[in-house]
Amino acid sequence: MTLERDAAANTAKVLSEALPYIRRYVGKTLVIKYGGNAMESEELKTGFARDIVLMKAVGINPVVVHGGGPQIGDLLKRLSIESHFVDGMRVTDAATMDVVEMVLGGQVNKSIVNLINRHGGSAIGLTGKDAGLIRAKKLTVTRQTPEMTQPEIIDIGHVGEVVGINTELLNLLVKGNFIPVIAPIGVGENGESYNINADLVAGKVAEALKAEKLMLLTNIAGLMDKSGTVLTGLSTQQVDDLIADGTIYGGMLPKIRCALEAVQGGVGSSLIIDGRVPNAILLEIFTDTGVGTLISNRKRP
């Protein structure tokens, strides 16, 4: 009986601690980039869906943007289509773009929507082609070595960058009590499809909606200093300094730049969160300490 009482007391404590945070975020929009291990473990997938439904139930407006790189790679392999990468970006020819649309706009998107709906939510799956949600243009990639007099332009196919976001559609869905789930496929001015990095799409969606938070789920505990210690709170200036001194480098750099630009573009804060931790989103927004790394020019509440 004591164990049951202790468990009940812990639950009551958590709910009591969460109350001021729920009040703070009621009516606010949070954009969550969903990817990595959180999309692979059945337990974590279920937990993510329940967390999103809970957020909506208490009056917070979650908007989900998802990735799907491993799933794209798996189908390309099964179809004997070779994958090539330039600076971490998948070279996307016409055949690869067809697969990207099938996987992101079909398999992955609808599985997330279905999971959220099974747990009591009202999710709607979208790609950037729906009502021109994500307007895009072809991404230009250049490379230059000391021996070159001019930079080399590298064609990586149907890889795009965001030009604009249809906020009218998203606001309409949010006001209708729906949870938008967005696949990062953009549409060009002539109707062409573009494969866009999900972190970048999430950042631009957060900026366009003037979201309270941008939350990027990752496979790491947060942004770390050179000694391996997680940095829990950083200003935009501190992030710039860490980029300049080489603390932030490699594959983490694009993600951090995306988080940084979102804050500079009007988002309240950006967070790098360990998606391997069960209920990581709720731990961040509903507890006193939070988890991961917060980037903001405000103090952590």
Curated annotation (Swiss-Prot):
Molecular function, one GO term: acetylglutamate kinase activity
Sections of the chain in a coiled coil: none
Pathway the protein acts in: Amino-acid biosynthesis; L-arginine biosynthesis; N(2)-acetyl-L-ornithine from L-glutamate: step 2/4
Pfam families recorded: AA_kinase
CDD domains: AAK_NAGK-C
Name of the molecule in the record: Acetylglutamate kinase
GO cellular component, one term: cytoplasm
Gene source species: Pseudomonas fluorescens (strain Pf0-1)
